[in-house]
Every structure is written in structure tokens, then in C-alpha cells.
Amino acid sequence: MSFINNILKVFVGDKSQKDVKAIQPIIAKIRTLENSLSNLSHDELRAKTVYFKDIIKQARAEKDTKIENLKLEVEAIQDIDAREDVYAQIDILEKEAYEISEKTLNEILPEAFAVIKETAKRFKENKQITVTATAKDRELSATKSYINLVGDTAVWANSWSAAGKEITWDMIHYDVQLIGGVVLHQGKISEMQTGEGKTLVATLPLYLNALTGNGVHLVTVNDYLAKRDSAWKAPLFEFHGLMVDCIDLHQPNSDARRKAYDADITYGTNNEFGFDYLRDNMAHSPEDLVQRKHNFAIVDEVDSVLIDDARTPLIISGQVVDGDRHEFTELKPKIENLVNIQRQLANGFLTEAKRLIKEGNTKDGGFQLLRAHRALPKNKALIKFLSEEGIKALLQKTENQYMSDNNREMPKVDEALYFVIEEKNNQVELTDSGIEIMSKDTEDTFFVLPDIGTEIARIEKLNLSTEEQGEQKEKLFQDFSVKSERIHTLTQLLKAYTLFEKDTEYVLMDNKVMIVDEQTGRIMDGRRYSDGLHQAIEAKENVKIEDATQTYATVTLQNYFRMYSKLAGMTGTAVTEAGELWEIYKLDVVEIPTNRGMSRIDKEDLIYRSVREKFNAVIEDVVGLSQSGRPVLIGTTSVEISELLSRMLKMRNIPHNVLNAKMHKQEAQIVEEAGKPGVVTIATNMAGRGTDIKLTAEVKAAGGLAIIGTERHDSRRVDRQLRGRAGRQGDPGSSQFYVSLEDNLMRLFGSDRVAKIMDRMGLQEGEVIQHSMMTKSIERAQKKVEENNFGTRKRLLEYDDVMNSQREVVYKRRRHALHGERLKLDIANMMYDTCEVIVEKNKLTGDFKNFEFELIKNLSITSPVTQADFAKLSDIELTGKTYKAASEYYTEKNIRDAHEAFPIIRNVYENPGNSFERIIVPFTDGIKSLNVVTDLKKAYESQGKQLVADFEKNITLAIVDDAWKKHLRKMDEMKQSVQLAVHEQKDPLLIYKFEAFKLFKNMLDGINKEVISFLFKGDLPQQQNNIQEATQIRQKENYIESKDEILNIEEQAERNHEAGQTQQHQVTETIVRDMPKINRNDTVKIQNVANGQIEELKFKKAEILLNAGTWVLVSE
């Protein structure tokens, strides 16, 4: 592939060279401007910022004036359609004003970049900078120790504290950093090697884009970097009167956090930006909002956020009522027993396989070997045996033989097992023998799901009364629900015991199960495995099993960052994923040349047969390198391997530091020491990324930092990150990867070819192979994994895009309700849509009586047309007349409500004994009641109109939030059930899109009807004593924030199979699904989603079935 790329470069040219060449004229302009700026005084240099802001303001002044005039104009417009037109004009003008701002920023870019470079230069060359004190200087001096006021002057020091460490400014931007800054401003990804100063590069586009006053966000992967970088770079911006803050320094939903977002430049972690967005979209008052519009974001380590985190959405959830009902503790002893029995069985198969293979009987030996592998693939003895000559090849040959013809022969292998593990797909399945063992000491059908269709047919043949039939069916559905949940719990426990290992996939800290990020080796604080798996691991580890939760709000980081008008990113390793970043995010990757040439030596991989040989060789190499005075950084892929190597080094009396998920708080300190002579540091999966390892002159003379990789990662990019720790800024260094046939990557994807070559060469234990051909073979295996992962991520994003478009609609409606500006327009549209639904439904059946009934029921109005007109008029004409009548009634009702409420409000307001600021007013529609909080003074001054407006806002928010919560649950259920379409040769994504649209339309229709019905029927209290003081505007709810793991398509489909059912996968959380209001004794029709069978029974009996999710209500 590299050969083809080289040929293409000859004919087409090198993309990175072309990109850099296109930017060179801008760099030349910056260099020209530097000389003129160096002659300016400090005050004149600072005045440039005010000058730039004025240019931007004047460029967009015409558009801004028009926008302000239209906003004033719209307040006086009563006609809803005219209002909608004005709001559309405002939106267009705002877009045009943004484009003018961007054009102006491009024009002032060279001078603005030159200003920041000159500022950096002056801070480096002067211990103190004395300027005329401004109001901003005086404000900052109260909290910043590096600014001192002396009379009318402000003295800025060039030393300050960043993340607890005293630093003296010593950096000036290189030309390559100016190129990186231009790339970031253009909304692209700047790939710069480690040590090339990405943090300093960001100061250029941050300053330029902050000049608009719309806010700029710098996003980091952890809070240490966010706090450190914001403190480290702040004086550079504050010197020019720009405010800098970090959201991670302040509590969520606080005034301080809102102030941080109001700053010109805001630093923070990706998670906190995302969670703040979700919290804002659960707020019930504009005062609770913290974020502004999403203007421009620069994402540090952009590959980590947009690629590694692609399967982890941010979730805000709340506890489920009865959500703690699980059988993990009860079923755990059974699973432990089953796993122990299978372990003995697997060891027996392995012993037998070894004997048969030794005797030359490879056919039967291969059969027993395959059994041992499908019983326990992570068995250490099995992994060691597979590294021996020819054994891995025999296993794969046998597996291919039994998997041929759609796994036709595989049951012969599995019949002796109690459960089967397919490690590649992360799946475990109980066999009949396993169910038999599990069912000991229980009834025979303890783990067997009843066949609903057959059982219902049997009950109906029993000549029972309707009541008795209903009771029998109710028992059947309860039995089905309990058992399907039990089987799911069982499967998750089995996974916890066989596929998830402590100190590899997770660690135990403070008696809690904490997930370890496989990409970075850091703890994913607050993240839980979904679907009961986390609870299963908690049961396995004997810690408290946390309650099940229900999703209230969710967003993927990818879709959050796509909301920004402009997005850019920085990383040292993106070029291997350039195709994915362009295809999914339309982000171009530009490779920035290094300031100095690279002198690191990257050696070919050393390949061993077994892990033991590999680790022994690693330790020997580390001892030699350390004794020669070179610092050594050992990269591992898990906490377990880190601790193993640590024990081996202790045995050799080699002092060392360990940096992994358990020690992430000491990260920066350990990384800083990693460049000292002879220091050995073990780091799990690039923990410590983002902190420089600086080398002394002594270390450089000895050969620089030595990187030792103990295993190849699934992704070439992560290996490049590890290599990139050495050789920064032209420093010497070396990198060497050690690989064994027992490593995960080799075991699952790449070892057959390598094993054959090693067998052919007759390599004995302890001998090693090192050749460029072998390294390329390993990289091909990595590429295969990357392609699989890309496919999965792209597919997941396509699913999330469906949810994202729905989220935008719902959150837009929430925002309108929250701010109130466009709420009247939304209510008018809801009113029209409700009228349209009522007309269409009844016009289709020609049912005038029901049309009249629905108008009274939902809108409290009588029909505006006669029966003859109803039959004669078209749907559009009828909807128009109905809407006009409803609108007139609603306007009159609002005037009446305000008029009736005002005397009560006046009495409360004018009562000298009351000092209320806010009051609670209860509203009711006869069924539900809602407490509306309103500002007493505003309600009094508007003569009751403010109360009506608050009523509209509160009811809209309450109903939208409730409907959205239920909709999220339904979407989750549907995403799992549509995967079964693959069995019918249909694309699940297309079905998901179609069904999601139907679900969403139904939800919106439901919201419209419910909101309008309450607004039309909601009555004010007639008594003053119903009104109370609102001491707290809103009770803060106990939400849980987490990052969750999205499963790929195969895993979801397997889940359905595990539970022994095909349409509905039962999750441990039991949420009551949304249904129309029906009396319990009403007769309803329901349909089985699996076989289409229709039943007619009383709603109280049907409700259990509907809750189980295997049946749906059939609308008449």
C-alpha cells in the first residue's frame, strides 16, 4: 500500500506539502508585520485588540442593527404567520452576520497572530511589563498575583503558577506553530508531532476568534490539562483585556460556571462541556442555563475524542422506581459453580488435546483443542500451548472446518460444554447442559421461557370464564417477564465471570467497580457498563450493587461537537484516521512539519513465541538501557501487565514508577520525572499524554528517551502515540516494540501467518525474529481491526444521527418555552397541528359526532361548522376554520384568566405583611395539577399577563420533558429489536429510521394534544389561600451522570438471542411504557409483535402484556 502511495505522490503530489505551501503567503505576511509591531509601546500593542474588535463590529454593524430592529418589531406583531416570517428573517441575518465576522477574521489574521507572537516575545524578554492600568487590569489584580497596581500603572510579571507549579514564560511561536494556528482557524485538524508545542499553537486562533465576543472553547481530555493550560496561557490573553476561565474549576449549574462560559476563552474537559449541554436542556428557568451559543471549539487530542470515544455517549439518568429488583446476588453462586465446572472441563479437554497431538492424532487433538478454546479462550494454559509450533494453525484449521456451511458441525463441538464463549464477538451462550446444571435445586422450568402463543392457545381451550382466562394470561405474562429478566441477568453474570477481568477491563477502587479506558489506560470516572453488565461485575466482586437507572438525556460527544459553527482539532496522530475524520466529520487533516528534523530511531518489532519469553527480553533490555544512563518509558496495554512488569523489575532491584488507572492523580509528576537519567517509567496505554517529557543534556548525550512497547495495540495510532513520546524537538531517542503470539492482537487477528513463518524457520523457545516483513504483517492485522472499528463507529453514528435530529427538534422547542420569545408561535403551531390531527382522523371515517366530541374534550370548543359543512369542506378548509375558532377561544381565555387572577395577585402584592418575590400558583385541568412559579412583581405590573405566560411555559416544559424521557426508552428498545431484520435480508438502519420517524411523530402529536388540552382546560384558583410563596424555584433532582458503552450490531442481536426471545430484549430496568389514557375496564385490542396475533381483552389485563413489550396496542 505504501508503494502505491509513493507512486501516487509522484504524479499527484504530496497533500501535506500542498497544504503547507498554500499557507506560506499568510506566514510571510505575519513575518512582515512582526517588525512594525516590535516598535510599538506596550500600551500601543494592547490597543490593537480594541482596534480589531472595532473592525469586526463595524463590518457587521448593518446586519446587527437590522436584527435589533426586527426583534423590537416582532414584539408588537400579533399575527402568528407574520411573526414566523420575521423570526425567519432574523435567523437569515444572524447567519449572514456570522459569515461577515469570519471573513473579517481572515482579513485581520496575519496582524492578530503577529500581536500574540509579539506578546509572547515581550513576556519572555522582560521580567516585568509596565502598562497604563485599565479597568480590566484593576479587576484582574484582585485575584491574579502576577498583576500589581502601582499608581496609574499595572505591572505584569512573567512568572505565575499553573496547576500548583511556578512557571516563567519562555516561549515564542515558531513558523511551524504559526502554520498550525492558521490550520486551526480554518476549522481543520492540525497534526503536530509530540513536543512541537500544540498548547502554544492554540493561543493564536483562540485570541483571533475571541475577538468576536461570541466565546471560544478549548477542549481537553482530562481536568488536569484543562486547569493547567488555562492558568498557563491566561496572562497572554488577559494582557489584551480578554477574560479566560476553566469550567472544571467550578461546580455544575453554578453562577461561577455560567461566568466561565461568559468568558472570551473557556477551557474545559469534553465530558463537562457535553454534560453542561444536557443539563441546560433539562433546565426549568433561563437563570439555570450556563452555556452560550456553540461558536468555535478547538479539541485537543481530537482523535481521542472523535474516534476513541465514539462508542461512549454522555448520559444523565435518574433512578428507576423499583429499579433495584435484580437477582444478581441469588444467581451468583450458581454461575460461580458453573464456571468452575467448565474450567475443570476445559483443562481436561486441553490435557487430552496435548496427548493426542503428541501421539500424532491431529484430527481428534484439534477437535479437543477447539472444545478447550470455546470453553475458556482466556485460559492461561491454553494461550501458552497455542504459542507452540503449529498449534495455533491447527486450531484455526479445525475451527474453519467446523464453522463451514453456516456452523453446521459446531454443535458437535459444543454439546459437551455448559456454555460457549465467542471471544471475538464478546458473546457467551448457555447450552442445554448448562441450563440443566443451573436448574438443579429449582423447578425444571426455572430458566425456560414459556412460548406465549402456544400457552395462550392452551388457556383459551380450557372453557374458562373471561375473568379466569384473564387471570391465567396475567400469570403467564408475569412468568414470561420474570424469566426473561432472569435469563438476561444470568447471561450478564456469565459475561462478567468469563470475559471481564479485574485490572484489565476494570479496577476496584473505594469498593467500586471503575472501568478502565482501553485506549488511554485512564479510569472512566462515572461511566458504567450498560444493560446490567456493570451490576453483574459488582456482584462478582462482592461490592454494593448500584440501582438501575433510566435515561433522561443523552448525547454523543461527536454530535455535541458537530453543533459548533466551527470546529478544529489538534493531535500528534490523526493521519491514519484521516479518511474517517473527513467522511464522518468533514474535518481535513493537515500534517504540520516539525521545527527540527526527527532523529528518533524506530526499530523493527521483536517477535517471540510466548509472553514469558517476551517479558524476560523486555526486562533485560530495560536493565541495560537504564544502566547506560537513558530514561526508559515502558508502554503496556493493561493495569495487570503494568503490575506484572513492576514485580519483575522489583526482583531485579530496578527502581521505577508505575503510571496507570490506579495512580492517575500523580500522572503529571511521574511523567515529568520520566526524562531523568536511568529513570524507568511504566505507563498503561499512554496515560500521561499531554504532558511533556523533557530531557537533560546528559540524557541527550546518552541517546535520549528509550520507548519500549510491550504489545502492539489494536490501533496503529495508539502505537504512534507511544513512539511519539521520544524524539521531541529533534531530541535523540529510540522505540522498540516486543510482540508475542500470545498477545491479544496476534491471538485474535494476526498470528496464523506469523506462526507459519516461525514454524518454517524452526525457531526454538526463547529465540526471536525481527524483520520489516514481520512488522508489516502485524500492521496489516492492525489495519484489519481499524477497518472493522471504523465500520462499527460509522454505523453507530448513523443510528445516533436519527436520534440527534429528533433531539434538536425537542431541545429547540424547550429553548423556546424557556425563553418565552417564540413560545406563542410554537403554541399556535401545536394548536394547528392538533386541529389537523382531529380533522384528518374524523374526516376519514366521516364521523361528525366524534369530531364534535374531540373538540370539546381537547379544545373545550364546540364545532365551528355544521354537519353538512363537515361533509362538504376539504381537510385544509376544515382545519383552517377549526384553528381559527380555537385560536379565538384561547385568546379570550388568556385575557379572562389574567383578569380573574389579577385581584388575587394584587391582594398578595399590596399586603404589607407579605415580602414574597415569587409565588406558586396551582393550575388544574380537572385531572392533573401543576404548580406554576411566577415573579410576583412582574405578574402585578402586567396585570396578570405574566402569570399566564409562565403557565404556558411551565406546562410546555413539563409535558415535553416527560414525553422525551419515555421516547428515549422506546428508541432504546427499538434499536435492539430492529437488528433482527438482518435475518430477513433487510437493512436494520432503514427500518430503524422509518420506525423512529413514526415513533417521533406520535410523540409530537401526543405532546401537542396534551399541551393544548391543558392550556385550554387549565383553570386558575379562585381562592387567595391557594397561593403560596415560592421559597425555592425548583427542587434539584438527584441525577446520575455517566458515560455509557454503546454495543455494536452483533452484540445487540446476540442479546436478543440470549434471552430466548426474538423481538423484545428485556433489560434490567423496568420502565412503564407510555400509553393513551384508557379506563381499566375498557376493552382494547392488542397485537403480538412477534407473530401478529390479535387479542381483545380488558385493559387492566392487557396492561401487563403491553408493559412487557411483546404486545402493542392496536388503535381502532
Swiss-Prot record:
InterPro entries: Helicase_ATP-bd, Helicase_C-like, P-loop_NTPase, SecA, SecA_CS, SecA_DEAD, SecA_motor_DEAD, SecA_preprotein_X-link_dom. The gene is secA. It is a peripheral membrane protein. Keywords: ATP-binding, Cell inner membrane, Cell membrane, Cytoplasm, Membrane, Nucleotide-binding, Protein transport, Translocase, Translocation, Transport. It comes from the Bacteria. Its EC number is 7.4.2.8. It comes from Flavobacterium psychrophilum (strain ATCC 49511 / DSM 21280 / CIP 103535 / JIP02/86). GO terms for cellular component: cell envelope Sec protein transport complex; cytosol; plasma membrane. Part of the Sec protein translocase complex. Interacts with the SecYEG preprotein conducting channel. Has a central role in coupling the hydrolysis of ATP to the transfer of proteins into and across the cell membrane, serving as an ATP-driven molecular motor driving the stepwise translocation of polypeptide chains across the membrane. This is Protein translocase subunit SecA. Signal peptide: none annotated. GO terms for biological process: intracellular protein transmembrane transport; protein import; protein targeting; protein transport by the Sec complex. It catalyses: ATP + H2O + cellular proteinSide 1 = ADP + phosphate + cellular proteinSide 2. Monomer and homodimer. Part of the essential Sec protein translocation apparatus which comprises SecA, SecYEG and auxiliary proteins SecDF. Other proteins may also be involved. Gene3D superfamilies: Helical scaffold and wing domains of SecA, P-loop containing nucleotide triphosphate hydrolases, SecA, preprotein cross-linking domain.
